[in-house]
Amino acid sequence: MRPMRIFLNDDRHVMAKHSVVYPTQEELEAVQNMVSHTERALKAVSDWIDQQEKDCSGEQEQPEPEEPETTEEGKDSEGKTGENPTRTLRGVMRVGLVAKGLLLKGDLDLELVLLCRDKPTISLLKRVADNLVLQFETVSEDKYEVIQNIREASIVIKNTKEPPLTLNIRLTSPLVREEMEKLSAGETLTVSDPPDVLDRHKCLAALASLRHAKWFQARANGLKSCVIVIRVLRDLCTRVPTWEPLRGWPLELLCEKAIGTANRPMGAGEALRRVLECLSSGILMPDGPGLYDPCEKEASDALEHLERQQREDITQSAQHALRLAAFGQLHKVLGMDPLPTKIPKKTKVETPTIDYTVQIPPSTTYAMPALKRPMEEDGEDKSPSKKKKKIQKKDEKSEPPQAMNALMRLNQLKPGLQYKLISQTGPVHAPIFTMSVEVDEKTFEASGPSKKTAKLHVAVKVLQDMGLPTGMEEKEEATDESEQKPVVQTPAQPADSTQTDSAADQAESAKQQGPILTKHGKNPVMELNEKRRGLKYELISETGGSHDKRFVMEVEVDGVKFQGSGSNKKVAKAYAALAALEKLFPDYTTYAEAPKKKRPPMMPRGGPKFAGKHNQGFGMMYNEVPPPQAMRGRGRGGMNRGRGRGRGGFGGGNHGGYMNSGGYGGGYGGNYNYQTSATAGYSDFFTDCYGYHDFASA
């Protein structure tokens, strides 16, 4: 749906401001490099800790060699314990601005959460930090400084180059929250904590940030303009001190609720105004409705940290901003100069190529393994589809223009030709059209599965009669080569280079000439299936890149194997079937090309509207004598020709009809129901450890 015209000017201002505060490509690359290097180093630390624990457990079990025999089940269990899914370091997750894609220009603080199997301790933190220094040297050439912050239960990592980024790794465990829930329920704890356990409140805050990141990715990332509006409002919170207390999780919740409850997608300007309207309504006031936190089990207000004066100031500022926007002065709210009213004609800017929703790929962090693929050296972090489009554009520029097909060539030589439809035969699901054209007092006819294909075949015949190239020569040469080599090939025998060249020519000619058909206008696979039932096509090879695949299919007919290749399996099967047909059945004829005889007129089904659409001989009893009038009633329940839903079929027996009793019996909707699923939607509550990376599966 197009945005309302009244908000177009607001959209321009919001998007212009967003492009100013959006981080540069160099900043995003630096963030991506630092985060991916840290994740890989933590994966190596986890492997190192598990190996040490495995060695220690092996030394303890060594003095017990009195087991008589080890069965296969015992060996399997040992193998499983070697890669125990409950590792000491269970996974690392991106949280905060990196996970939500809310980074602005100048944001230098990044966050990760490291989940542990047990409650994190000071000794574990020191152990991870010490080994992390060694792992950074093997993972990357960049230099990083590792600092232990025991008071904050985190490890701080700083890079040594511009921009000076700081990555905060917070240690936590789901056991911390489980213990808090048991205590609140009045249960007694049987397990005592280690003496050097880290601060419980810091661990709970890390778990909360993990829930917030998962909720944001599930609810806010899919809303149009939501992420853009949050970035613009984050900049407003930085510029205007009044808005500073709203920054962070409360602002994200407000924007999602205001934009997500709209009945249609909104542009950036309209979405920003809707958020301002929500704040102006008094939602922040002490006697207001408040803001429910969906990531907590118990009902809690996400705005409880705001003081009364702060709530009033933010509400008053939002009302003032809404008045400015209503009078066309949104640029004052955004802190920018007004844009010209007339949009310049030349607006070719590179900004549309930027995916503003996703900053640091991959965006769905929790659906990906913990070990990220390192970024390429040249810094190309664009999506594969854009790379593919670039490659295609380069190929189009470098290659000469494609040759005209036969129809275009004939229209260029003889403009104004009139193509006529002679006949239409075959069943409804696979009709065969016969077209004709008169050129120089000669009439040419050809058939095909569609009028366009039949016209193309007619043009080929005309050009062949005139002695001109048709563009089909490459295809004919390729089929000749397949006729000369139908012999059984051993699997070890490599494919000929000429064969692959001919396959490429076949695929290229197929693109230019339309669908692959036999000389009777049928699909080769379907026609070969009529001759030999139950044939099996096997995939011999698959070569080429993702944008230029080559498939080779093989079929065995009467003990002889035939191969065909194409850009997909369907085309390769068609060429294999075509080679078999032209080799084994060179002189066969089909029913569609039987001698045309003038038959007595048959009363068409359904009146003259459906005349000529059904051949009398396709599996039906045909009688030249028209049925009696009593058998041809057209009303509901009219003898055997009733046409109502659920009535008897079209007249059967020897009266040339279809015995399809039952009509549309049953109606619609009887079998169309959607199964409910536990994962069909997003719950309002998110647990702590669902969906995190497991180091063991990485």
Curated annotation (Swiss-Prot):
It is found in: Nucleus; Cytoplasm. Residues 61-71 have a biased composition (Acidic residues). The keyword RNA-binding applies. Residues 490-503 have a biased composition (Polar residues). A motif (Bipartite nuclear localization signal) lies at residues 372-390. Residues 399-468, 520-586 form the DRBM domain. SMART domains: DSRM (SM00358), DZF (SM00572). One of its GO terms (cellular component) is nucleus. GO terms for molecular function: double-stranded RNA binding; mRNA 3'-UTR AU-rich region binding; mRNA 5'-UTR binding; sequence-specific DNA binding; transcription cis-regulatory region binding. Residues 72-81, 374-384 have a biased composition (Basic and acidic residues). Keywords: Antiviral defense, Cytoplasm, Developmental protein, DNA-binding, Methylation, Nucleus, Phosphoprotein, Repeat, RNA-binding, Transcription, Transcription regulation. InterPro entries: dsRBD_dom (IPR014720), DSRM1_ILF3 (IPR033099), DZF_dom (IPR006561), DZF_dom_C (IPR049402), DZF_dom_N (IPR049401), NT_sf (IPR043519). The keyword Phosphoprotein applies. A component of a ybx2/frgy2-containing mRNA-ribonucleoprotein (mRNP) complex. Also a component of the CCAAT box transcription factor (CBTF) complex. RNA-binding protein that plays an essential role in the biogenesis of circular RNAs (circRNAs) which are produced by back-splicing circularization of pre-mRNAs. Within the nucleus, promotes circRNAs processing by stabilizing the regulatory elements residing in the flanking introns of the circularized exons. Plays thereby a role in the back-splicing of a subset of circRNAs. As a consequence, participates in a wide range of transcriptional and post-transcriptional processes. Binds to poly-U elements and AU-rich elements (AREs) in the 3'-UTR of target mRNAs. This is Interleukin enhancer-binding factor 3. The gene is ilf3.
